[in-house]
């Protein structure tokens, strides 16, 4: 999918100050580039629900954080997401790894993929799917558009790893 070094460079150009995350097998490949960044602070969390509270505090303090988690963690973080996005109205941007988008392992369906888009829609969250054909500049445009409009949003990154 998106290369870690190129993604970190883009996030820096977009003015992202913090990446609050609990990585998965696909997005975790960005770790080396994120950890080496001199401008973006990487904040590792134990549970995905923590990521939203931390990102909210950073945002309220004037930072420009994003949350990076896998779809199964997105499910776990529902109440924190609801509070931050809908009750507080904060424009937190999320990158969500879409596990199972390209199928399961050895013919088994990964139900993690079954629920992501319906749940994102149920949360009334602006979102966009990024597949292996997508370009990094499309992610940049989506980020800029939603931040300029003051809306929380989720970039759903179709994972090619299982």
What is the predicted function of each stretch?
Residues 1-162:
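Thiamine diphosphate
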């Amino acid at each position: 999918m998106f290369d870690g070094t190129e993604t970190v460079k883009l996030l820096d150009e977009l003015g992202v100050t913090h990446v609050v995350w609990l990585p998965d097998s696909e997005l975790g490949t960005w770790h080396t580039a994120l950890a080496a960044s001199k401008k973006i602070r990487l904040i590792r969390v134990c549970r995905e629900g923590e990521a939203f509270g931390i990102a909210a505090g950073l945002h309220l303090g004037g930072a420009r954080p994003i949350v990076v988690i896998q779809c199964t963690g997105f499910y776990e973080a529902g109440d924190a997401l609801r509070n931050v996005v809908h009750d507080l109205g904060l424009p937190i941007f999320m990158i969500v790894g879409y596990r199972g988008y390209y199928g399961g392992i050895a013919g088994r369906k990964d139900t993690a993929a079954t629920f992501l888009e319906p749940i994102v829609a149920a949360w009334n969250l602006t979102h966009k799917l990024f597949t292996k054909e997508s370009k990094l500049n499309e992610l940049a445009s989506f980020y800029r558009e939603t931040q300029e409009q003051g809306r929380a949003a989720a970039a759903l990154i179709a994972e090619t790893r299982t």
